[in-house]
Swiss-Prot record:
The keyword Transferase applies. It comes from the Bacteria. Its EC number is 2.-.-.-. One of its GO terms (biological process) is lipopolysaccharide biosynthetic process. Adds the second galactose to the lacto-N-tetraose chain in lipooligosaccharide (LOS). Keywords: Glycosyltransferase, Lipopolysaccharide biosynthesis, Transferase. This is Lacto-N-neotetraose biosynthesis glycosyltransferase LgtB. Pathway: Glycan metabolism; lacto-N-neotetraose biosynthesis; Bacterial outer membrane biogenesis; lipooligosaccharide biosynthesis. One of its GO terms (molecular function) is glycosyltransferase activity. Transmembrane segments: none annotated. Belongs to the glycosyltransferase 25 family.
Length: 279
């Protein structure tokens, strides 16, 4: 298995974390130098995802994260490999990860390398909907189909045909239809146009930040992307037509009723959903 870890060349602490995490399991890996806002990023966007450059709300860091995945896929396609495993440099690995990442016989026995597929290895500890896939369990983990949004791109396996699908799709989408790369891959299933995503359960990996949050612990590595997303949500609200005195007054007067309705909707949305565990 080719394991690629997206990481800034200057991120010494995170690279040391990855070297220890993968090295202690005997899992081979190679770093892929992540992009940052730069001329290199602008060239990559112009070549692969032209609509991204003009996106009004995604920050430079979010665009760089998006393009780091896209450029890595393009590199893998140029090399002619049938599939790759992709990780981000704040990932934690679960028990027996070497059974999945130090070999790939299990993958070849369960998936056609010439088909389009994604195996999501990560959990974000959010409620998700899955359905049976018919893929046989391996190493005490199942491969159900992901039927709802599940954020994050800290760990996944993607086939050559799936890489080509996403790159071709990203190349023609206008700015308003582009979102952070994790939502493009693992957001609304209808947006994937039939691209199957299997959600490993229990998950093989998790982002250190979200693992810490889920267990009420302090994060050792943090997340620049999370910070940028919070700022962008605030900016979108400030720029929204709904952010006028009249609309703010109406929202204040109807807040209790809206909160009650939101709670009802959340209860309905959680029916049948699970939190994918990490172990």
């Amino acid at each position: 298995m080719q394991n690629h870890v997206i990481s800034l060349a200057s991120a010494a602490e995170r690279r040391a974390h990855i070297a220890a995490t993968f090295g202690s399991r005997g899992i081979p890996f190679q770093f892929f130098d992540a992009l940052m806002p730069s001329e290199r990023l602008e060239r990559a966007m112009a070549e692969l995802v032209p609509g991204l450059s003009a996106h009004p709300y995604l920050s430079g860091v979010e665009k760089a994260c998006f393009m780091s995945h896209a450029v890595l896929w393009e590199q893998a396609l140029d090399e002619g490999v049938p599939y790759i495993a992709v990780f981000e440099d704040d990932v934690l690995l679960g028990e027996g990860a070497e059974q999945f990442l130090a070999e790939d016989t299990w993958l070849q026995e369960r998936f056609d390398p010439d088909s389009a597929f994604v195996v999501r290895l990560e959990t974000m500890f959010m409620h998700v909907l899955t359905s049976p896939s018919g893929v046989a369990d391996y190493g005490g983990r199942a491969f159900p189909l992901l039927e709802s949004e599940h954020c994050g791109t800290a760990g996944y396996i993607i086939s050559r045909k799936a890489m080509r699908f996403f790159l071709d799709r990203f190349a023609v989408l206008p700015p308003e239809r582009l979102h952070p790369v994790d939502l493009m891959m693992f957001g609304n299933p209808d947006d994937r146009e039939g691209m199957p995503v299997c959600q490993l359960n229990p998950a093989l990996c998790a982002q250190e930040l979200h693992y810490a949050k889920f267990h009420d612990q302090n994060s050792a590595l943090g997340s620049l992307i999370e910070h940028d997303r919070r700022l962008n949500r605030k900016q979108q609200w400030r720029d929204s037509p709904a952010n006028t005195f009249k609309h703010r007054l109406i929202r204040a007067l109807t807040k209790i009723g809206r909160e009650r309705e939101k709670r009802r909707q959340r209860r309905e949305q959680l029916i049948g959903k699970i939190i994918v565990p990490f172990q």
